Every structure is written in C-alpha cells, then in structure tokens.
C-alpha cells in the first residue's frame, strides 16, 4: 500500500515536474488527467486507473473508457496539437491553450528555476503584458483589491496568475485592457514571491498547481495523516474540503469550492481565496471549461456560482470561520485574476471580500492562513456572492466595509456570536436551498474525478500519496484516536506539516476568537454546536423531512455525480462512503444535520473541514459528534435513510452518497464484506452463519474486518433518534440515543471515525468509545478492534442492555448485540451452538470470540439477536441492530435507552448512556449485572479504577510485559480496544487470569469469574467506580448505571463510562470533562473494570494491530508493574484510579512493584534495586548507615530475599531450559542419525536392486546369443550359465527331471565337470545323471584353452553374482564364440 502510495506520489510529482519544465499549465493538463484517473476499484490499495483517455472530445462520448492497463502518458496530457482542444477551449478556434491556465505556473517555473524573484516578476509582467497586449483579453492582475476591469480581482500574494485564455480571446466581449500594474508590483513583490516554504511545501504547492492534489474536495480531507497526526481541517494539503466535496455532491455547490491549500502556506489555485476565473462563460467554455471551472470550483453559471458560494460559505461556516470577517482584500490582494465576465469579477470580489472578512492579511503567513481558509472564505464568498452581486461589486465595499452577507447578520469577528453564526448558517442554508434547484446541474457539472480522492503527504518525502482505503481507514481511526484535546492543534484535521500544525493552532485560536465564544459551552457542547443546534431547530422540520436531501436525492446525487469516484460500483461506493464517513471526523458537526443530513448541507459537506474548524474545540468535537451522530446516524432519514443520508448529512455528502442500503459496513467493510448490516439480528445471524467459519472470517472474518467495525457503529443498524430530531429515528446517536445527544453535552465525539460508529453498530458502544475513545490506536486495525471491543454491545451505552448483555467487547460486528446480560454468558448463541471443546477447536477469531463473548453473555444472539429485552429495546446495543429494531437504539436512545436493557431498565439515555455515555445520565445502563460481568471483574480487580494491568491482564493473553501494555496509546487511545491492549483486561477486568479456555476468553466471560448476571448490577467494585481515567476500560459493572457513569458519577456503581486514560482526558477536547457533560472528562465513571468480555478481549492479539488490544492498555506500564499492578489493582488501583488525579498517581504506582510500593510506604531510604542487587558487604554497609526500624529492616530483608530468590529462580529456570535445550539437541542428533542411517539403508537397497537388475539384463542378453548344438536358441529354462573359478563360463543344460531342480542339476554338473579332462572332447558329463539325459555335453567354450576341462565352479544359472561372464557356445559346426561380458 505504501509502495503504491509512494509510486503514485512519484508519478504525480514527475508529471508535475515535467509539466513545469514544459511551462505548461499543469492545472489544465492535470486537470484533465485527474479527471481521468480514479481509485482503482479492482486492485489492491488505491491505484489510479485511467478512466478515460485524455480528456478529448472522444472522452465526452466515452468518458469512462478504462485505460487501466496504460500508464498516463504526458503525450496524452499535452494535447497541444489536438485540434479538438481548440474547439473546446472556450471556442477559441486555433487556440491550443486551455480555456484558462495559471500564469503563475510560468512564474513559478521561472522563479523556481532562477530563484530570482525579480526574474519571476519580469516573467510575470511579460506574460501579463504579452497576453494582455496580444489578446487584448482581460487579464486582470489585481493586487490589493484595486479594482480591475471587473473591479473584482484580488491578486494572490503568491502570485497565482490565472490567465483566462477565453478572456484573452479577442472575440471575448469581456476582455478588457490590462489594468494598471501597480497591483502587479504588489503581486510581484519579491517578498510575496519568495519561497518562504520548505521544499516539501513548495512541492505541495506545485502539485496543487498541477491540480495533482485533488484535495479540493476530498471527503478524506480530515483523515489523519500517515503519522497519525490529525490534519487541520483545512490542512493545507489534505484539505479535501469535505464541505466543498459534500456540498458539491449535495448539489450545494457544483464545484468543490472548499479548496485546500496545498500547504498552509500555499493557497491552492483552486481556492476561492485565490480565485481562478473561468475566462469564458460556461457556454463558451463548453464541457472542458466546465470541467476546469468545476475543478477549480468556479463556474460561470451564476446560479452555480451562487450555489458554490453558498456551499463554500457553508463550509466556511462549518469550518467555524466567520464569513463575517472580511476576507481581507489584503489576503489575496495579490492574486492575479484574469476574469472575463462580470460574474467572475463578482466572485473574485466576493472572494476578496471574504478574504478580508476572514482577516487574511497579505503577509505570507496571512496568505497561508488565508489560503488555508480560502475554502472557508470561498464558502463565505459564495454565500456572500449573491449578496455581493446585489451589492455593488466595488471591491471597496469588501475592503472598507468588510463585506458581509446581508442575509447573515454580520458582526465583527470578535463579536461573531453563536447567534451570528447561526444566522449565517441559516443564510447559507437558505442560499443553498434556494440553489437546490440548481444542485442537479451542479452535480452534473461536478466532473472532477479527483474530487474527494484522499491523499496524504508523506512526511518524510513530502510526496503526495493517494491514500488507499485501508490507509484512509487507518487515518480515520487515527482521527478517532486523535486526542479530543482542547487544544485544537490536535485537530483531527491537523496537518502533518508544521505549517499546517501552526495553522491549526491558529485556527483553534481563530475558532475561539472568531466564534467569540468558548468552543465548549458549559454543557460541553460548543457554542457553535449550540448555534448549530439552534439552527437545527430551525431546520429540524427539514431535517425531519430529510428535506431536500432524501435518500432518493442522495441516490440521485450519487447518480448525477459524474466523478468516476462515483462511478464506482455500489460496493466500492459504499466502501468509499463509509470510509468517508469514518474518515470524516465522524461527528459531522452536530448541528442541524442531526435531523436532516442536509440541514446544513454545507455543514455536512464540510463536516470534516468544518468540523475541524468549527468544532475544533472539544465542544465542537462534541457537537460534531452529536451532529454526526445525528447527521450520520440520525441525520439520515430514518435508519435506512439515515444511513445513507445521515452520515453524509448532505445528500451530496459522500456519506449520503453511500447507498442508504441497509446497514453499512464500515466503509472499509462495505466492499469486503457482504453487508452484514442486516437490520435484523437474525439476518445478521444468518450472515454470521454465512461467514461463520468459525470466525476467522466471522462475519466476513472479523479478523479480516477487524480493522473496521462492521458497521459504523454510528450507523448502528438501529437508528437512534438523531440528536437533531429526537423523534427522528436517525440512528441512535453514534454515541447514544440521538435524543439525548443533542441535549446532552455530546459525549466527546468519538474518534473522528466515531468510535461509536466503528465500534458498534450500536452506537451506544460507540458512544462510549467516543467518549473516551477519541483515540484509537493509530492503526485502523486498532481502531476497529477497539471499536469492536468497544462495542461489545455492552457499552454502557448499550445501555444497561449491553450491560445486561454480556459485555460485548466486540463490536457488534458479529454478534450484533449482546442484548441481554440475562443469559448466562455461556448461553450465547455460539456457545449454544458449540461446546467449549468445539469452541476450542475453532479458530477463535477475535470477531468470533467477540461474538461468543457477546453471545455468551446474553442473547444467545451473538449476532445481537435480542436475547433479552435488550434487543427489544435495542437498548443501545446489538439489540438495536438486530432484533429488527432498526431504531432500537433510537428507541433506547430516544427514550434514553429505555427498554429493559436485558431486564434492567436503562434510564433514559441508558442507550444513550453509551451514546452519550449516558450523558443523559440514564441510569439504565445498569443493564444486567451480567452486562458487566465486568462488574465482578471489576470487583475482582477492584481496579477498575487503577488500571493496573493485573498479571492476568498482561500475562494473560498478551504477556503484560508487552510494551503495548505499557503504551496503550501507541496504537490506540484510551478507548483503543484493540485486542492488543492488555488494558482490555483493564485492571478491573483484569481479573486474575482465569485459566479460561481461550474461547471463553474471547467470547465469553470467564465462566469462573462470574456469572454474567451473578453480580448485582450494583456490585461494581468500588474501584471500578473510581474511574481509571487512564484506560478506558469499559469495564462496566453490570450494576453501573450508565448515567452515573456518564456524569462522572463514578459514584454510581452502575456508571459504565469508560474510564478514560489520563491521556484521554487530555484529549477530550470534546469536553468530556470540560463540558461537564454527563461524562466527566474523566468518565470517572468507572472505567469499570473490564469485564471478561473486555477480556474477550481477546487475549489473542493476532488479528489486531499491535496495541489494538480491545482495551487500551495503561499508557506506560512497565512489566515490573506486573507485580505492582497486581497489588495496585487490588488496592490502589481501585481507589486511586477512580479519580482522574488518582489515575496519574496510579499510573506511577502501576509501574511500581509491590515491594517498591511497600518500601515507599515505609520510607525505606534504599532503592529496591539496590536492596536486591548490592553485594552483601555493601548492602550491610548501607543498612548500617541508616537508622532503620525493625519493620523497615524486615521489609528490606524480605525484598532482598525475594529479589535474590527471583534471580535464583530465573537462573534455575535458565539452567532447566538449558538442560532441556541440550536434551533437545541430543534427541535431534539421534533422530538425525537415525534418519541418516535409514537413508543409507535405503540407498544400499536401491543399489542392490539396481545391480541385480543390471545383471539380469546381462544374463538375458547373453542367452539371446547362445545356441544349442542344433543351433536353436538356448532357453534360460533349459540351460544355465555357470562360471568356473577361473572365470570361465559354461553353458550347462538344466536337468529336466522332475526330481531335480535346476540348482541340483547345476550342482551335479559341477561335480562331474570337476571329473576329468578328455582330450579334445568336452568331458562327458556322465555325472550329470539322467538330468543330462539329453546327452548334451557341456561345451567347453573357452577357446584356445586346453581341452582339459577345468573344474567348473557352478553358479546359479542366473549367475547373479557373476562379474565376468564368458560364455562360449559351441556351434554345431564346431565354431566357437567367446563372449566376455563385464558389468
């Protein structure tokens, strides 16, 4: 995957460089090229496929011709001589130039080549003057906002000169003489042109210029970068503005307006901030122009522009940028715009104004920010544009007054209040709605295949790497993992580049300042969110209706989108969409979208972007989370619709684009797994059965899917009322019931990918995750895993139901819900089906195990069949999924997770509990004790709080030594539930490692440990209550009431809130704690010790990425601590970890061994290592230095004794091991010897046979030539060859008498032959007896030898041993033949 990415990056880079060398406008070429490229839908990873040959006229006819086998050729891109281009180029007959191109390309090339800004300036002037003079076209080089012909061009400080060839066309009515170049001077000012960017940034910029980075609207914009660092929402390079993308798809804008600066420092040419105007009107441009226009987010069509503006403005709003801020003429004053028509001028002006409004300044930094925000500003511009149009296009307005949308109640940035934002959003929404009718056209217009294609920039090489889906997902997980910290710099969209990072920080500041309010409201919901919600309220009716974005709309949108991305097959689309969903910080802003995804199309569209911005704050995150929950989950119309629409929350959004079809699999799963999203558990069960190869592929092979939740938990199959519209079934908020989601401070948004979504189809779990789980392990797998684990259905959110349900560590993926904890853990579906032995035999995949786990505890429906009421109310958990409660969650969520969560009433919000982590405070979470067997676990470990991995924890499946144990954060955040995290056995869960059968481990609670419901729900260990913030072990005691937990009411035994790891607290920008939301940031709610379910955790880490243990492991646990941990878990963990503060101390203690702790408690002055390791003399000397009490001395001696014993034991074990190894070696040697001897024997056998066969062949050969006295061939049956001692060979007749066998005859012959010698006569073989009755005489065949017969040594006739065979046959004629044969 990486290689593919790099390869792609290299190709693009080479192409960009080649184009640069050719001084050809890469925007044009790449534009055309990009439009022809698509993610490979048939290969591994994302590979570009030439969907079409170069964009030629023929492309128009067969736009999707697949040139997959052919690599793009520059010749294809450079159609200078292609006459068709001339016709296409804005109707400029012989013109080979694209309708417009970026003059800065040339400048850039010159500048880069010469490094002399002056040269660049000259070149620029040259180009400008030449083009202006030659064509008389309107090449507007505007700087500073000085009015140009259109009065609306703003120069880009970076010198983006967009030359519109169409405008240059003499026939172009709009062409106007070049305006004074005073602006050019500004534009060309060396400082502006100086490369103040790193090479990497420059490369990015170049790529952007080449349109190589089609980030402009990538749905993946907010995906975390490869290094796991969240990109800033407008992250320069990855800024695929979802706002724009989604907006465009929703029809909000035909072109992806949210442009992403390649670098924070480099405005993207397509940014509206640096507007490139299409020179020719749409009509003139023809398809290609439209193509380019859309690519650049520009379209002459006024409606289109208005829509774009609205969309962009919305995106801007979403981003949290106040459109009020003057987009600063200063910002992009330097941008050179060559615009030929009024509309474009207006757009430019609007953009300019927006730049001013956004407070962009001309200085490089400002420009960088501006470019970064340009997408936002663009959005603002868009919305302002219509207004702008209404106003005089005089730039002065924008500059002097800081143009403000009339619709939007403009306030100064400082005063931009939630009300202002709300109104702005409303205005934007209105604009969009007004433009909805145009959306269809816009969608048609959207032809940039690259829109929404995610790429990342290699931090090391600066290469642009197209992200493979897996990578995206990982990134998403990373996002989810991205700390929800208050500091926005951790914004999920944080760029990997320093500039981006800086920008993010600025942005965070900006967000706060711009919004003029703390991102987090007291509730923990960002004010913006509140504003959004207010707006949502306004929009709710629409939301409820699904308004303009209905599933059908979504489908239409999908269909209308021409981008190859959207030409993908359904599965691919689904996968992309889901991926997008996960990628987009899932929490699309909570705003209005909850009710209807489209509530603010822009919001969703920009959900990622704007999320990053608007909700940078934790509150924002929370809001997003909520919004996302609603938008994603609830946002969709109903679950089915919601799924399709909700996620996207914008019809156009990628999410919406996903087919509303039944559940989604995580996007990643969409393609690879058949959808198990059946809404009904039974169906899933069927699916499960289908995929149930004991699990390796449990459901598509959890292991296979492990990286991804089966469904977005957010999309839990059950819809929960979206927050926005409680009534709306919108899937249960990803975090919990949508109903409370809105009201309650959203739990911290789940990791961007919605922990809930990932974790649990039932968001409830996800909810929990989200809360604590903003971070997943960096790798997707971890996230998924954690999601799976997270979602054991048993999140609190799952509500008590989940609680009742066995704690379902697993994601509902397979077992869609453990709905009831009532059932004995072992009662689970799988358990029912298989005996323990069978399970043992099974390949317990994590997924399978999880299934088992789920099933075991409750509903036999691993699949989430409702085993108990749980399903029925769908309270938050699998039940929601299965049991056909499409909205089970919603029901729960709406009702607050009402329903008997497996018999325990989940307080309102119980479902939501998880969802909102019980933000609603639904106590219902108490769900059955069963739910958390963990509770018993907790009790056992007592540590829920102190997440000291008990030995069992680490040793257990994973050997807690593993670094993973110590670094839960490595792959996952506190919520990382990947298998690897030992924390999965959070201390609480960390029950002594029961020698459970592995399968039990996986899927089940340890039967030994607890009966699922055996513990009273209220029995959570006290420690459990204490939150161990450090690990989120979702150890919920069954009794923990989710609500208590949510509020940090760890006090409530039932609180199921995951304990966040300390880290987590830092991350909860979502304000878990900050918001004071039900979940205290700490979720003090007890992290209830993980249940065995947690355990389910899967002590096997095989399928998950390392560190993805189902529970996050404590951040830094040393193995030593194992012992200490045990102790800690027993005691301190319970108390200390319960409180966040306690957690930190616990963490410290976790690393301490029991002896260390005791020594510390007794204030022993000698360190434990010294006590153990010092030589006796030195040790005694040290002891003598201190006045130690008897207790201290006793402890010191004990410590030393234990330490020495430990060493001795280790040595003993080592010796034993050495002996074993030695014996093993000896045994191996013996075996080897035996093998060798056998081989030798076999070889000898084979040789013997070979020789025997060879001799037999010789014997036969000789007989063929022998003749009897009559000249007849001798038959071996009648004659035998005998060899004498001297080597002579005799042919002797065999005795035929019955009494004698050949051997006897031969023997007799020998004896007789030995008789005598008859001169010249062959001795008569009288002795031969009657055997030789033939009277045949043995012929002495040795020629030349004396007639005396030598004594013959007779050999068996076959003469097998004979080496020399001399045979002489005496022919009747007395002729002698002597034959010597040697083997």
Curated annotation (Swiss-Prot):
InterPro entries xref list: bZIP (IPR004827), bZIP_Maf (IPR004826), bZIP_sf (IPR046347), NFE2-like (IPR047167), TF_DNA-bd_sf (IPR008917)
According to its UniProt entry, what is the function of this protein? Plays a role in posterior cephalic patterning. Probable subunit of a heterodimeric regulatory protein involved in the control of head morphogenesis. Isoform B may have a repressive effect on Dfd response elements, thereby modifying the activity and specificity of the Hox system and moving the body anterior/posterior axis.
Which segments show compositional bias classed as Pro residues? 744-753
Region (Disordered) residue ranges read 258-286, 376-421, 516-549, 585-626, 717-758, 860-897, 923-1026, 1102-1157, 1297-1383
Lineage of the species this protein comes from: Eukaryota, Metazoa, Ecdysozoa, Arthropoda, Hexapoda
Ranges of compositional bias, category Low complexity: 867-878, 935-945, 1128-1146, 1299-1320, 1346-1383
PANTHER family in the cross-refs: NUCLEAR FACTOR ERYTHROID 2-RELATED FACTOR (PTHR24411), SEGMENTATION PROTEIN CAP'N'COLLAR (PTHR24411:SF55)
Name of the protein:
Segmentation protein cap'n'collar
Q: Which keywords appear in this protein's UniProt record, sorted alphabetically?
A: Activator, Developmental protein, DNA-binding, Nucleus, Transcription, Transcription regulation
Q: What domain of life is recorded for the organism?
A: Eukaryota
Report residue spans for region: Basic motif: 1197-1234
């Amino acid at each position: 995957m990486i290689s593919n990415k790099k390869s792609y990056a290299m190709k693009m880079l080479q192409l960009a460089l080649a184009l640069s060398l050719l001084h050809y406008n890469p925007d044009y070429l790449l534009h055309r090229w990009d439009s022809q490229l698509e993610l490979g839908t048939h290969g591994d990873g994302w590979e570009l496929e030439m969907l079409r040959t170069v964009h030629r006229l023929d492309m128009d006819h067969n736009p999707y011709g697949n040139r997959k086998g052919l690599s793009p050729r520059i010749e294809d891109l450079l159609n200078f001589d292609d006459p068709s281009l001339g016709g296409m180029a804005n109707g400029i007959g012989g013109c080979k130039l694209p309708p417009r191109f970026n003059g800065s390309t040339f400048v850039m090339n010159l500048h880069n080549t010469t490094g002399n800004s002056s040269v660049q300036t000259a070149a620029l002037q040259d180009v400008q003057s030449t083009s202006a003079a030659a064509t008389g076209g309107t090449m507007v080089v505007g700087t500073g906002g000085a009015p140009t012909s259109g009065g609306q061009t703003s120069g880009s400080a970076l010198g983006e000169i967009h030359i519109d060839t169409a405008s240059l066309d003499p026939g172009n009515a709009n062409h106007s003489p070049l305006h004074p170049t005073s602006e050019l001077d500004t534009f060309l000012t060396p400082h502006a042109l100086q490369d103040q960017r790193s090479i990497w940034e420059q490369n990015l910029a170049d790529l952007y210029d080449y349109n190589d980075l089609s980030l402009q609207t990538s749905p993946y914009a907010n995906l975390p970068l490869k290094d796991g660092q969240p990109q800033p929402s407008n992250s320069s390079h990855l800024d695929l503005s979802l706002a724009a993308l989604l907006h465009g798809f929703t029809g909000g804008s035909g072109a992806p307006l949210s442009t992403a600066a390649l670098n924070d420092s480099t405005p993207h040419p397509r940014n509206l901030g640096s507007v490139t105007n299409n020179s020719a009107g749409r009509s003139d441009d023809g398809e290609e122009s439209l193509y380019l226009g859309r690519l650049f987010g520009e379209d002459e069509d006024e409606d289109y522009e208005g829509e774009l503006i609205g969309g962009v403005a919305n995106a801007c709003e979403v981003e949290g940028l106040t459109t009020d801020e003057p987009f600063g003429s200063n910002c992009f004053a330097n941008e050179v715009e060559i615009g030929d028509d009024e509309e474009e001028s207006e757009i430019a002006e609007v953009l300019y104004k927006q730049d001013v409004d956004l407070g962009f300044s001309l200085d490089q930094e400002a420009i960088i920010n501006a470019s970064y925000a340009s997408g936002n500003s663009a959005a603002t511009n868009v919305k302002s544009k219509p207004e702008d149009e209404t106003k005089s296009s005089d730039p002065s307005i924008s500059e002097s007054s800081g143009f403000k949308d009339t619709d939007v109640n403009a306030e100064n940035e400082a005063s931009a209040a939630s009300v202002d934002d709300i109104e702005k959003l409303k205005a934007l929404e209105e604009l969009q709605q007004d433009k909805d009718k145009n959306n269809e056209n816009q969608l048609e217009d959207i032809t940039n295949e690259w829109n929404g294609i995610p790429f990342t920039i290699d931090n090391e090489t600066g290469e642009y790497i197209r992200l493979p889906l897996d990578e995206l997902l990982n990134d998403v997980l990373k996002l989810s993992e991205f700390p929800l910290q208050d500091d926005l710099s951790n914004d999920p969209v944080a760029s990997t580049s320093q500039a981006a990072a800086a920008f993010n920080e600025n942005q965070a500041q900006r967000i706060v300042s711009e919004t003029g309010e703390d991102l987090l409201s007291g509730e923990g919901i960002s004010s913006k969110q509140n504003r959004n919600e207010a707006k949502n309220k306004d929009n709710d009716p629409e939301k409820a209706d699904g308004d303009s974005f209905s599933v059908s709309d979504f489908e239409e949108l999908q269909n209308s989108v021409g981008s190859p991305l959207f030409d993908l097959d359904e599965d691919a689309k689904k996968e992309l969409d889901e991926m997008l969903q996960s990628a987009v910080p899932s929490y699309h802003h909570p705003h209005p979208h909850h009710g209807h995804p489209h509530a603010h199309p822009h919001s969703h569209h920009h959900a990622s972007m704007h999320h990053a911005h608007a909700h940078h704050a934790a509150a924002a995150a929370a809001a997003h989370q909520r919004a996302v929950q609603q938008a994603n989950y609830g946002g969709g119309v109903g679950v089915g619709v919601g799924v399709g629409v909700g996620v996207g929350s914008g019809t156009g959004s990628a999410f919406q684009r996903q087919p509303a079809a039944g559940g989604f699999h995580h996007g990643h799963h969409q393609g690879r797994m058949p959808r198990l999203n059946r809404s009904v558990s039974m169906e899933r069960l069927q699916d499960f059965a289908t995929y149930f190869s004991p699990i390796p592929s449990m459901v598509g092979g959890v292991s296979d899917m492990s990286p991804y939740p089966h469904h977005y938990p957010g999309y839990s199959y059950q819809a929960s009322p979206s927050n926005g519209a409680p009534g709306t079934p919108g899937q249960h908020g990803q975090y919990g019931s949508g109903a409370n989601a809105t009201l309650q401070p959203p739990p911290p948004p789940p990791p961007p990918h919605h922990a809930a979504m990932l974790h649990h189809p039932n968001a409830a779990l996800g909810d929990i995750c989200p809360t604590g789980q903003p971070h997943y392990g960096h790798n997707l797998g971890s996230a998924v895993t954690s999601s799976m684990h997270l979602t054991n259905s048993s999140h609190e959110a799952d509500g008590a139901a989940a609680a009742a349900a066995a704690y379902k560590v697993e994601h509902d993926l397979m077992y869609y819900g453990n709905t009831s904890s009532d059932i004995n853990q072992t009662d689970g579906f799988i358990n029912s089906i298989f005996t323990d032995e069978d399970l043992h035999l099974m390949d317990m995949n994590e997924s399978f195990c999880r299934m088992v786990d789920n099933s075991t505890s409750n509903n036999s429906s691993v699949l989430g069949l409702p085993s108990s009421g749980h399903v029925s109310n769908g309270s938050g958990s699998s039940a929601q999924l299965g049991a056909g409660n499409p909205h089970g969650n919603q029901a729960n969520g709406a009702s607050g997770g009402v329903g008997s969560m497996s018999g325990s009433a989940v307080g309102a919000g119980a479902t939501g509990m998880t969802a909102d982590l019980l933000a609603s405070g639904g106590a219902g979470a108490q769900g059955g004790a069963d739910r958390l067997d963990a509770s018993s676990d907790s009790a056992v470990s007592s540590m829920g709080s102190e997440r000291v991995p008990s030995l069992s924890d680490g040793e257990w499946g994973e050997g807690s030594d593993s670094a993973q144990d110590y670094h839960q954060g490595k792959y996952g955040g506190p919520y990382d539930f990947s298998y690897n995290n030992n924390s999965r056995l959070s201390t609480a869960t960390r029950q002594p490692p029961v020698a459970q059968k592995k399968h039990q481990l996986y899927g089940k609670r340890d039967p030994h440990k607890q009966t699922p419901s055996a513990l009273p729900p209220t029995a959570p260990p006290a420690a459990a209550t204490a939150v161990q913030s450090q690990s989120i072990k979702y150890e919920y005691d069954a009794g923990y009431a989710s609500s208590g937990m949510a509020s940090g009411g760890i006090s409530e035994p039932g609180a199921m809130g995951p304990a966040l790891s300390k880290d987590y607290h830092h991350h909860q920008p979502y304000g878990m704690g900050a918001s004071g939301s039900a979940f205290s940031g700490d979720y003090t709610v007890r992290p209830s010790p993980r249940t065995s379910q947690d355990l389910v955790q899967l002590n096997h880490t095989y399928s998950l990425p390392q560190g993805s243990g189902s529970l996050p492991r404590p951040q830094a646990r040393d193995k030593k601590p194992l012992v200490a941990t045990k102790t800690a878990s027993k005691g301190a963990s319970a108390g200390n970890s319960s409180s966040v503060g306690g957690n930190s101390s616990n963490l410290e203690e976790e690393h301490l061994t029991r002896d260390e702790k005791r020594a510390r408690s007794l204030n022993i002055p000698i360190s434990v290592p010294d006590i153990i390791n010092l030589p006796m003399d030195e040790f005694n000397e040290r002891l003598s230095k201190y006045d130690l009490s008897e207790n201290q001395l006793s402890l010191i001696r004990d410590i030393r004794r234990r330490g020495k014993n430990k060493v001795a034991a280790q040595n003993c074990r080592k010796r034993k091991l050495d002996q074993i190894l030695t014996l093993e070696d000896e045994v191996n040697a013996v075996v080897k010897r035996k093998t060798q001897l056998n081989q030798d024997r076999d070889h000898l056998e084979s040789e013997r046979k070979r020789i025997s066969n060879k001799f037999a062949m010789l014997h036969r050969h000789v007989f063929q030539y022998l003749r009897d006295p009559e000249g007849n061939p001798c038959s071996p049956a009648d004659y035998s060859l005998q060899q004498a001692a001297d080597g002579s060979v005799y042919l002797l007749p065999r005795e035929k008498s019955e009494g004698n066998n050949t051997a006897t005859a031969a023997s007799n012959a020998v004896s007789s032959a030995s008789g005598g010698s008859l001169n010249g006569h062959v001795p008569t073989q009288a002795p031969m007896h009657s055997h030789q009755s033939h009277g045949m005489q043995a012929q002495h065949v040795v020629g030349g030898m004396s007639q005396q017969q030598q004594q013959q040594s007779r050999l068996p006739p076959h003469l097998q041993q004979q080496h020399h065979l001399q045979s002489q046959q005496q022919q009747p004629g007395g002729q002698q033949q002597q034959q010597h044969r040697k083997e």
